[in-house]
Amino acid sequence: MLMNSAARPMLLFRALARRSASSQAYTDALAHLKQDLKKAMLAKDDTKKTTIRSLLATIKNKEIDSRDKPLDHFALHDIYSKLVAQRRESIDGFLKNGRDDLVQKEQLEMQLIQAYMAALPVASAEELAARADAFLHELKSTHGALPLPKVFAQVSWPTVAQDWNASPAAVRSALAAAFKKSS
């Protein structure tokens, strides 16, 4: 489908507006990825180059999918977490099939993604678990034993990203894990 010349600038403006509405940490992380891609290309490091290209493609697809909603570093952390989980599943499959060469490649990619994930200014899994435990302990002392849906109802979801320094999905999973552990 061909686009008329008047529509092209509007699409470019929307993409720039979305990216400028993103958090500074998100913008810095993308710039760092692009800079590392250039370095990997110059160093002819194929593993790093393909991994970074994969990251950038996944991020771009997420930007396209979430059209009008600007992404932030929490969304980037969720993307990285999903990619690390995919690598872990691939490693398990390759180990079952005796493909040690592919296991090593996937492990290198996973370590690289984890390094980028660690550079993001978000709460670690340990910090989230401690915060979730404290939150549940406080709820039990004030309201008694509550079922998980009522625990979720006590969370201030509009401000959870800033309060907990994590994405709502990460907070939800940390609370569920802490609830399961305490039950």
UniProtKB/Swiss-Prot annotation:
Show the SUPFAM superfamilies listed in the entry: GatB/YqeY motif (SSF89095)
Give GO MF terms, alphabetically: carbon-nitrogen ligase activity, with glutamine as amido-N-donor
Keywords in UniProt for this one? Mitochondrion, Transit peptide
Give the residue range annotated as the organelle targeting sequence: 1-20
* InterPro entries in the cross-refs: Asn/Gln_tRNA_amidoTrase-B-like (IPR003789), YqeY/Aim41 (IPR019004), YqeY/Aim41_N (IPR042184)
**Localization, UniProt:** Mitochondrion
Q: What family is it from?
A: Belongs to the AIM41 family.
Q: What is this protein called?
A: Altered inheritance of mitochondria protein 41, mitochondrial
Q: Which organism is it from?
A: Eremothecium gossypii (strain ATCC 10895 / CBS 109.51 / FGSC 9923 / NRRL Y-1056)
